Amino acid sequence: MSNIIDVHGLTKRYGDQTVVKGIDFSVEKGEIFGILGPNGAGKTTTLEMLEALRTIDGGTAVIDGIDVAKHPKKIKDIIGIQLQSTNFYDHLTLTEQLKMFASLYGSKVDVAALLAKVQLTEKARNYVEQLSGGQKQRFAIASTLVNSPKVLFLDEPTTGLDPQARRNLWELIKQIREEGVTIVLTTHYMDEAELLCDRLAIMDNGQIITTDSPHNLIQQLLKRGFKKKQVVEQANLEDVFIDLTGKAIRD
């Protein structure tokens, strides 16, 4: 499968400090690619350079054949961005906001279909402040789809959500990928990365340490002799929580 993102020597500096240190990676068309790392590793800065939100101080990033540094406007036309702290307008309904976002791209959007995709049809006339945490995150993703992006960037999309809302969002992310959209996400949750991502890049101190599928990374660790005491259960506490509170969406 061909690459839709190619990154070579990508670098970001703030004064004397280099926070992203000449990293290389590629993302295949149609995959979910995750970037894992501790706070301060450079994950968000890397995404922001790919999104043309921060200047690139060294190296290159190419998305769908377009150089990010040379053509930032063209890049913004083909990507969707869901930030950690997405801000919406308090005085506009969900329907009005999606129409406004679409107008910024000069595109038309079927608002009803988009709200149905994120299971917010009944909230079409509501304001963002009236939504639960999970509903806000789903609406944030809906807002990134108004321009039919080829690549969707999600920065810690399930932070602050309860287990049930997290699983609902996972299903939405997988559905979007099945429709042909490439997804690049950052996360602190190992279970999320293992469930969603086809491949992962693990970052630390501004560098990419390794890139591979979750399965291969685990197998490589085991081959090095890693062992831990493990009790295999058929369910976990998160499963209990969701079973007791209901499997239908209750955000």
What are these regions (language model features)?
Residues 99, 103, 108-123:
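Conserved ABC ATPase "signature" region
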Residues 127-131:
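Conserved ABC ATPase signature
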Residues 148:
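Conserved catalytic motifs of ABC-family nucleotide-binding domains
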Residues 152-156:
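Catalytic Walker B motif of ABC-type/P-loop ATPase nucleotide-binding domains
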Residues 211-212:
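ABC ATPase "signature
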